Amino acid sequence: WFYTANRFWTPEHGGTHIDAPIHFFKDRERLDELPLERLIAPGAVIDVSAKCEGNADYQVTVDDLTAWESEHGQQLNDVIVLLRTGFGKHWPDRVKYMGTNERGEAAVAKLHFPGLHPDAARWLVTNRKIKVIGLDTPSIDYGQSKDFKTHVTLYEQNIPAMENVANLDQLPEKGFTVIALPMKIKGGSGGPVRVVAVMDQ
């Protein structure tokens, strides 16, 4: 007979993961409290890759979101929003993906990657009812953020965010269902998440 067993260790916020709202806002949902119906929903890909190509500090705007709505004739309600910056293609080159190969506090000032503008986050929580938001960069706030307003704005309203989401370049802008199932860590502020897309027939 044959037997294999391994041990693994991981931070809550490494690799492809989901932030529970408690990560940046007190008394909000923890990882094990996220309802399943929020984690399985139609997907909407907002493609800003052309804008990010020459601007690693690009922040997704309200206009980017409303342009998707105008093109597809529907509002961003009851969907999982996925921001395609194109930065996923740079992984695992840390310099291209994050702006620096350094780690820890010394790296913070050198981080450069796109994110969601706080004004766009505020517009979403005020005017739309999205389930989850995700993107193909290390953080929902852009790399040069010092106050993490996008995190705070979303998480205050119990809207989780997925970071380091892979293969967004393989998805259409609509016409699929996202299934995002995180490791169910009791009391977790986040954790690894397996994200799959099922194409509509």
Spans of model-derived segments:
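Active-/binding-site microenvironments in catalytic and ligand-binding cores
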Residues: 1-201
